[in-house]
């Protein structure tokens, strides 16, 4: 305890004896007088001192000095009491609060020294408010944001980065990897990544979405798992960091505000007793002791399993985080290359309605973007007041019968297959399909025409497999139509040679064949000789008729006997014709017709 403050007597009571009356009336004549010595003035003039005493002290200046002195003493008492109470309060404050209060006191002391003594209390309060207002930071204008102000995306990514760095207490991924730390690292890893590079990209606002940040984080962990072996610490930490990071940055954790701010506790160091200590404790170590030591060492140095095994409870969350990351990457890629497209799939409800679900919809929309699919959505709306559509038959492209002998198709087929009838051509088209199929079948048969029966049978089997058995049916039907046509014609004696095994005399057929061949040969020679003789005659008649111009077109000379001889039907024997007309009957003059 300090020294107790001594109380001061504020005043002394005195009176003048000459002015007082009786002792009973003296109480009203007490006068308050200060207990002070009179002022002494010492003047030095030329080395001599002159002392002068002041008067009785009843001047007006004395009372003014007295009031100022009492006011100052009163202030000092208040300050002392305030300091004492503040010291008692400071006992229960922490260091930061004490430091802050000391700075405030120092600042106030400096301000009071700068202020003049004649300022009023009101002015001082206003002055204090103004000074305190200047200590506050100047607010930036809202219309012109500061250049270094971070965007909400940057703040979110910085928060993610801080949380991820807490998961790496040893700082393995804090800075870029060099060849001195990991020899041959850049020969294996082509795209290195670390936390410092990610922080620079955040500060430069290079990340346009959280998906790009997650892609760089996954690249960093994949690089560590690619370069290091599974039993190393770096591989295990990278796999664990990948799992926890994706779980933290998942959409559900971001929406629910799942903040994992707890720092990982360092694993306690396990100190195994050395073999020497064991021997000291037991001079004769048994086999059980060695077995226990081996089991303990194997449990310590045994490599950890996968961070996300099939039996792990966090496996589903890890897979969900990876799936969400892949979905976000696919959505960003679609929006980047096809910004206005809507990709989805069709789904049928229980009531039978068909719904189209959009995959790359708005990610902020929690509900699925679905559309009902019906005929009105697939086709345009019909105009009102039109219930039926008009129909007009087009007669310009009317289909006619294709099997008639006068059509263009039958004429074309006759030019391609001159030795076949229209019915046979139809059978071939029905069996082989088109012209290409018919030509292919004929080409194969022509190729094995001079071969044996085995090759022909192989070709027929091949055509049957190609046409599905239509080849054999076509040949059978064509052979049947030929047999029907031959039954109506003259008997073919040469076909009877196949019945030689029957008890019939076939010697006469060979002689008939020889006679028929000789007759056909002689007839062909005679026809050629006659035609060669008639050609010069036709040439002479043509010259006679075309050499001289007739006098008038109305009169034409009569036909001569030579003309009738050359134009007779017996001379025109080029093929078999049923109706042959005399060409000269159309060239008679009109005079002869009038005479008749």
UniProtKB/Swiss-Prot annotation:
The record marks 181, 234 as: Histone H4K5ac H4K8ac and histone H4K5bu H4K8bu binding. Its main location: nucleus. Residues 148-252 form the Bromo domain. Residues 226-228 are annotated as: Histone H4K5ac H4K8ac and histone H4K5bu H4K8bu binding. CDD domains: Bromo_brd7_like (cd05513). Residues 548-559 have a biased composition (Low complexity). Residues 61-73, 85-98, 537-547 have a biased composition (Basic and acidic residues). InterPro entries: Bromodomain (IPR001487), Bromodomain-like_sf (IPR036427), Bromodomain_contain_prot (IPR051831), Bromodomain_CS (IPR018359), DUF3512 (IPR021900). Residues 1-31, 49-119, 537-596 are annotated as: Disordered. GO terms for molecular function: lysine-acetylated histone binding. Pfam families: Bromodomain, DUF3512. Keywords: Bromodomain, Chromatin regulator, Nucleus, Transcription, Transcription regulation. It is found in: Nucleus. It comes from the Eukaryota. The Bromo domain mediates interaction with histones that have acetylated lysine residues at specific positions. Also recognizes and binds histones that are butyrylated. Plays a role in chromatin remodeling and regulation of transcription. Acts as a chromatin reader that recognizes and binds acylated histones: binds histones that are acetylated and/or butyrylated. This is Bromodomain-containing protein 9. It comes from Xenopus tropicalis. The gene is brd9.
């Amino acid at each position: 305890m300090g020294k107790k403050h001594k109380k001061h007597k504020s005043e002394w009571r005195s009176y003048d004896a000459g002015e007082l009356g009786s002792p009973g009336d003296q109480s009203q004549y007490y006068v308050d007088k200060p207990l002070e010595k009179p002022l002494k003035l010492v003047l030095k003039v030329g080395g001599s001192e002159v002392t002068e005493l002041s008067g009785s002290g009843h001047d007006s200046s004395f009372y003014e000095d007295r009031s100022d002195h009492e006011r100052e003493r009163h202030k000092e008492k208040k300050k002392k009491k305030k300091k004492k109470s503040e010291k008692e309060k400071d006992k229960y404050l922490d260091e930061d609060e004490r430091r802050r209060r000391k700075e405030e006191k120092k600042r106030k002391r400096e301000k009071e020294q700068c202020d003049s003594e004649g300022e009023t209390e009101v002015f001082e309060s206003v002055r204090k408010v103004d000074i305190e207002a200047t200590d506050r930071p100047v607010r930036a204008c809202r219309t012109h944001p500061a250049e270094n102000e971070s965007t909400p995306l940057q703040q979110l990514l910085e928060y993610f980065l801080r949380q991820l760095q807490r998961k790496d207490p040893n700082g393995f991924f804090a800075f870029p990897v060099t060849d001195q730390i990991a020899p041959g690292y850049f020969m294996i890893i082509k795209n290195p990544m670390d936390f410092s590079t990610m922080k620079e990209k955040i500060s430069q606002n290079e990340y346009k979405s959280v998906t790009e940040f997650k892609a760089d984080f996954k690249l960093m962990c994949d690089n560590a798992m690619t370069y290091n072996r599974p039993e190393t610490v770096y591989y295990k930490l990278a796999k664990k960091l990948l799992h926890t990071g994706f779980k933290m940055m998942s959409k559900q954790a971001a929406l629910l505000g799942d903040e994992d701010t707890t720092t990982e506790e360092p694993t306690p160091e396990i100190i195994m007793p050395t073999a020497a200590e064991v021997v000291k404790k037991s001079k004769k170590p048994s086999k059980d002791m060695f077995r226990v030591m081996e089991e303990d060492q194997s449990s310590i140095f045994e490599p950890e399993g996968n961070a996300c095994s099939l039996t792990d409870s966090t496996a589903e969350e890890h897979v969900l985080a990876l799936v969400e990351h892949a979905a976000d990457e696919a959505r960003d890629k679609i929006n980047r290359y096809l910004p206005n497209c809507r990709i989805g799939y069709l789904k049928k409800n229980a009531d039978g309605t068909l719904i189209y679900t959009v995959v790359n919809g708005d990610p902020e929309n929690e509900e699925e973007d679905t559309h009902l699919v019906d005929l009105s959505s697939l086709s345009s709306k019909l105009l009102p007041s039109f219930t039926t559509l008009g129909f007009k038959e087009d007669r310009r492209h009317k289909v006619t019968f294709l099997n008639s002998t006068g059509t263009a198709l039958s004429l074309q087929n006759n030019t391609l297959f001159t030795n076949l009838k229209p019915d046979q051509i139809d059978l071939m088209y029905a069996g082989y399909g088109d012209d290409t199929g018919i030509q292919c079948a004929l080409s194969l048969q022509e190729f094995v025409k001079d071969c044996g029966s085995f090759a022909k049978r192989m070709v027929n089997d091949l055509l049957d497999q190609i046409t599905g058995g239509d080849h054999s049916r076509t040949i059978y039907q064509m052979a049947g139509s030929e047999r029907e046509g031959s039954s109506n014609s003259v008997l073919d004696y040469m076909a009877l040679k196949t019945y030689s095994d029957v008890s019939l005399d076939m010697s006469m057929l060979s002689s008939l064949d020889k006679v028929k061949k000789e007759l056909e040969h002689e007839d062909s020679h005679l026809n050629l000789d006659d035609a060669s003789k008639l050609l010069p005659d036709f040439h002479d008649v043509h010259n006679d008729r075309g050499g001289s111009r007739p006098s008038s077109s109305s009169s034409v000379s009569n036909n001569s006997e030579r003309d009738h001889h050359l134009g007779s039907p017996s001379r025109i024997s080029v093929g078999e014709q049923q109706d042959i007309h005399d060409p000269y009957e159309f060239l008679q003059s009109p005079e002869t017709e009038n005479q008749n």
